[in-house]
C-alpha cells in the first residue's frame, strides 16, 4: 500500500510505502484532523482495521496496563514516522533530480547495509516518491550508469562509490 498526495494539477507524490499490517493515519488522529490530505492506494486486495481515535487516545477509567502500553506504542510509532518524514524531506529538499536520486539511493544502501539493494518502486513510483519527472529520472539513471556510478535493472540497484 502507498500513501499518496495529489496536488491541484493531479501530480502524484508518494508519501510512504507501507508493509502489510503497518498502521497509517495515526498522526491525523492524534492531531484531531477530520479529513486527511492523503489517499491510501492498495496494489492488492486489502482489509483495513479501523480504530477510533478517541478510544486510542483516552485510556479507560481503570488506567489499565493495556492502555498505557497502547499509548506508549502510538508515541513510539509517531516518533519513528517523524524520523522517516525527515529522511524523505532530506531527499526532496535537494534541487536537482540527480541530487534527489543519489540521496535516496545512498539512504537505501545505508539502510540495507549494502551497495546492492532492491527498492519498492518502479520508475514511475520512484519519480513520484522523489517528486520529479519520470523521463528526467530515467535520463539521470542512464547518465549515472554511463559514468559508472551505478548499475540498475528495474528496481535493483548497485552503487559503485
Indicate where each model-derived feature is located.
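Glycine- and acidic-residue-biased ligand/ion/polar-headgroup-sensing regions
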Residues: 1-6, 20-22
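A generic structural motif
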Residues: 4-8, 41-43
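Residues that act as N-cap/strand-start positions at coil-to-secondary-structure junctions
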Residues: 9, 34-35, 144
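Cyclic-nucleotide recognition modules
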Residues: 14-72
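Inter-domain helical "communication" segments and dimerization helices
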Residues: 59-72, 76, 80-93
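Short alpha-helical segments that sit at the start of domains
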Residues: 84-108
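Phosphate-/nucleic-acid-contacting segments
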Residues: 97, 104-161
